[in-house]
Amino acid sequence: MSPSEYALEVAKRRTFAIISHPDAGKTTITEKVLLFGHAIQTAGTVKGRGSSHHAKSDWMEMEKQRGISITTSVMQFPYGGCLVNLLDTPGHEDFSEDTYRTLTAVDCCLMVIDAAKGVEDRTRKLMEVTRLRDTPILTFMNKLDREIRDPMEVLDEVERELNIACSPITWPIGCGKSFKGVYHLHKDETYLYQSGKGHTIQEVRIVKGLNNPDLDVAVGEDLAKQFRQELELVQGASHEFDHEAFLSGDLTPVFFGTALGNFGVDHMLDGLVEWAPAPMPRKTDTRVVVASEEKFTGFVFKIQANMDPKHRDRVAFMRVVSGRFEKGMKLRQVRTKKDVVISDALTFMAGDRSHVEEAYAGDIIGLHNHGTIQIGDTFTQGEDMKFTGIPNFAPELFRRIRLRDPLKQKQLLKGLVQLSEEGAVQVFRPLSNNDLIVGAVGVLQFEVVSSRLKSEYNVEAVYESVNVSTARWVECHDVKKFEEFKRKNELNLALDGGDNLSYIAPTMVNLNITQERYPDVIFRKTREH
């Protein structure tokens, strides 16, 4: 393959994830995006728990029962001359660190906001994570077919709470029962909405020009007049789109529509392929790797168990950073310094696996893993380096875990360590006793862990509450001061699954006082894998 052909393949790639608060419509928008990418023929209504139409991106038994997407799957589809990789992230109240880590593997994010509710808690948290890498953000204001808040007010809230400038690309005409469509500010065109056509791609009627009398006929004179006045205000008060500011994560283009009604999603996709960056350079501990390099490099950002209920395999998800992956290729696993031949890598359309013949920078491939791959592992064609920026996040919820059958302590520890390497949960072993404490970012992680311990390790475990409210990884450059810190705080110290020392605090107040008392000790919220 010539360098110019390779450069073309890389330039076509767009890799993004969707971030939203639960029930803002993320799974629905995922389906509609796949519909436009012709990856599925009709959109099954999501959450139809009793029906056989489960959303394409929700799998694993627990998900099917609850109508939520726990596992982060990957879907690739063509759109507008590009190849788009969509990484699905759990959006339910109970999500996990996987969600955070997935955001480190994409070049761009789509933020979905319920226009009736505005900025919600989970959206804030996820936006904080995208800030770690200044990821570019597109915004989709959803549920315009319902009664919503004043769009200007919602934009102000996004700017104020998420500290990002908003640049409206489309603007709604009416909402709820009187939702008539959107006007595209860049194209000077109005797209008219028809309700009840959400399952397929609609033939949309377009009215060219803002002052076209056809617009008055289509939406009614009063609404048209009101809309033109509103638009004047919007254009005066909002930011012009600036591509550089978008790429640096300082400005977000905003699109309006309804994912359920399948309206406005294509405008967002057009913006994505036009403006979102092709695969970006990434830092390693020795240098920066650029996507156009010939040699293959990639890193593992997530490990998922039992994607195939018939086999107890685990799949490691790897983001290709540079070069081209080919079937049967020999790669160096940098952490273990071993060379491995990858003959059966996978690509994904949720739930349907197919074997990869080749993959390029920006693509996500799945590697079969029998316990030898860990999160954060770097694979190269021989070069010794490690990609940085794939973090562990300090858990926010803690439980003590206890066995029904005390003789299975060994299996429990083995299971927990493996699950922590996968990123399903974090394990802490206090230095002062034999407790096992598990830490998570979302409640559902605890359920997932106990059901997997039972099915994969044949261990029945029960949870008990524990007096821990937060944890931090600790380190100190002054050995003497660190020894004193360890001696005086032994009751609050624990080792995590990778034997890293951590401070487990009963309250935030306790943590703050301890930090003030030991200014030389560094307390970290995230830890590199």
From Swiss-Prot:
Q: Which GO terms describe its cellular component?
A: cytosol
Q: Do you know which InterPro entries this protein is assigned to?
A: EF-G-like_DII, EFG_III/V, G_TR_CS, P-loop_NTPase, PrfC, RF3_C, RF3_dom_3_sf, RF3_GTP-bd
Q: Which UniProt keywords apply?
A: Cytoplasm, GTP-binding, Nucleotide-binding, Protein biosynthesis
Disulfide bridges in this chain: none
Q: Which GO-annotated molecular functions does the record name?
A: GTP binding; GTPase activity; guanosine tetraphosphate binding; translation release factor activity, codon nonspecific; translation release factor activity, codon specific
Q: Where is the signal peptide?
A: none
Cite a single Pfam family from the UniProt record.
EF-G_D2
Q: What is its main location?
A: cytoplasm
- Describe the location of the tr-type G domain by residue ranges: 11-280
Residues noted as binding GTP in the record, renumbered to the chain? 20-27, 88-92, 142-145
Q: Which Gene3D superfamilies match?
A: P-loop containing nucleotide triphosphate hydrolases, Peptide chain release factor 3, domain III
PROSITE patterns noted in UniProt: G_TR_1, G_TR_2
Name its cellular compartments: Cytoplasm
Q: What GO biological process terms are annotated to this protein in UniProt?
A: regulation of translational termination; translational termination
Instruction: Summarize the protein's role.
Output: Increases the formation of ribosomal termination complexes and stimulates activities of RF-1 and RF-2. It binds guanine nucleotides and has strong preference for UGA stop codons. It may interact directly with the ribosome. The stimulation of RF-1 and RF-2 is significantly reduced by GTP and GDP, but not by GMP.
Q: Which family does it belong to?
A: Belongs to the TRAFAC class translation factor GTPase superfamily. Classic translation factor GTPase family. PrfC subfamily.
UniProt-listed NCBIfam families: prfC, PRK00741.1, small_GTP
The protein depicted here goes by the name: Peptide chain release factor 3
Q: Record the organism.
A: Yersinia pestis
